[in-house]
């Protein structure tokens, strides 16, 4: 890797239709070069060649980063000083306030911490009174999930949940559970 490189830039070999500017149509993404140590090249899925629909024959996988950085139909990887100048890098896939140009904001790279509560609720969203297990999953983007806290009073107080199941590494979802007593009703 070039010592002064700042980015790992991956380019897909998608066919650009005649008449379109390749800089506006091709998929090429630059991510910080630190991604390289955990990035993977995928050419198989479940023991068979990676299908075209999933980016085959070769796909870049950047764990902990938004999916747009997992370039499909990979044709080139380069280590560069500058980010790619194609449209999908310079202007697209950015989180910006409504009415603001995306190009003024950083590209979507690292995923934020994410979590979901998966139970206890029925189809109506109502919880029955009594002892319950609040179960969910959490993922830390590019960081290891070290703990999960759950609030049952809209953020007024927090209780530490326990991890259940195996720890499959910092990029994997972690399942958690909190045993508590609740009144009947709906909770956010």
Predicted segment positions?
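Extended, aromatic/histidine-rich regions of cofactor-dependent oxidoreductases associated
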Residues: 2-188
């Amino acid at each position: 890797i070039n010592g002064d490189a700042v980015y790992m830039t991956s380019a897909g070999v998608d066919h650009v239709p005649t008449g379109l500017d390749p800089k506006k149509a091709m998929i090429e993404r630059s991510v910080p070069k630190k991604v390289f140590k955990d990035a993977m090249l995928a050419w198989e899925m479940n023991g068979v060649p990676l299908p075209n629909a999933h980016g085959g024959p070769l796909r870049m996988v950047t764990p902990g980063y938004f999916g747009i950085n997992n370039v499909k139909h990979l044709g080139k990887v380069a280590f560069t000083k500058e980010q790619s100048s194609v449209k999908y890098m310079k202007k697209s896939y950015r989180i910006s306030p409504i009415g603001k140009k995306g190009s003024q904001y950083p590209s979507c790279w690292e995923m934020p911490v994410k979590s979901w509560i998966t139970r206890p609720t029925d189809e109506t969203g109502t919880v029955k009174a009594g002892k319950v297990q609040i179960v969910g999953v959490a993922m830390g983007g590019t960081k290891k999930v070290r703990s999960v806290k759950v609030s049952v009073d809209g953020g007024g107080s927090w209780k530490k949940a326990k991890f259940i199941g195996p720890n499959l590494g910092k990029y994997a979802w972690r399942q958690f559970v909190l045993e508590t007593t609740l009144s009947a009703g709906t909770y956010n």
